[in-house]
Amino acid sequence: MFSAPGSSLTRWLSVSVRGLRGLSLFSSSESSSNWSKVVSDAEKIVGYPTSFMSLRCLLSDELSNVAMHVRKLVGTQHPLLNTARGFVYDSKNNLQMRGLIVLLLSKAAGPSHAASELLTKDMVSGIYPSQRNLAEITELIHTAFLVHRGIVNLKDWTVSDGPLKDMQFGNKMAVLSGDFLLANACTGLAELNDTKVVELISSAIADLVQGIYYENYYNVEDGLGDGTVLTPWEDQAFLSHGALLAKSCQAAMQLAKHDREAQRLAYLYGKHLSLGHKLNSDLQPFVKSRLGEVTSFSLSAAPVVFHRQIVGKEKWHQQLEEVKHGQSVTLSALLAAVKSEKGVSSAVDLCRYHSNRALEAIQAFPSSEARSALENIASAVNRF
């Protein structure tokens, strides 16, 4: 059903890449009570739950008409249904975290010295209206790409995936609804009347497109290709998972007319927080699975990528072939093989590094509840 070359094994292992990759940031399965408390406390600081930040657009007449057609997909296996269901589980899965981070940073930074007194009077709960609009725009862009990621590659369609016409119809709805959300985001972006912010968010959209291209390009059998075409894992992860948040954080500082240093620190916080949480999400199958338990994991997950680099391409190919042909190595043994090498520990170390870098970046902001919430969020991605 999803675009994964090769055997049924590689399709099974890569389903999280094709079907759930858009949910990987701030929606991993580790949604513990600790993480939920961190998010809940942070939402109280910004004034309202960000789980419904894009609800205004989602409930518009135009998208309501699209939703009526999407209902026809009920009973099919098209991934757009799972995406739609995700909208009502936002408060549980923390899907709308980007907007929350933008609002927290805006509140933590406060008004700049360059801001006029008239502009300062427009602040609500320490946040400018334009910054709240930016947070909504950020969520709309993320949601649009999340919907687009659910488009099925019909070249890999099989009878077991259900009727072909259902997949074709679902793809049309995914393209239409994703484009609608993106168009609304771009309209809102223009209404901010700040060319630098438009440039920043536009470049983030370009980064997302490039990152998704890399994700689609990589060869499942080879892990991440031969290393000459694709960027290193960190660069690729930043494009598809971190650029939007990092540049939105920087744009929030620009809207409040903060200096370049404040913008740089906000960018760094968003960047390192994104990468830290991506690593945390990738690590979940390897730190939570019990001995002998078969857990679905992605071949593009950081521990697997690092494992492949450690053991070498030839041995990695051999391990995949043994699983594919049902030889001595089973799926659970492949998971154990990855866990036995230093790939997992390397990913854990890198996760801690990015968590610490995010904490360092936020220290320059004035001490406040908002800054404490940002510190708690950065620390939470370092817990497994």
Which residues make up each language-model segment?
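Transmembrane helix-loop-helix
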Residues: C186-S203, K313, L320-E321
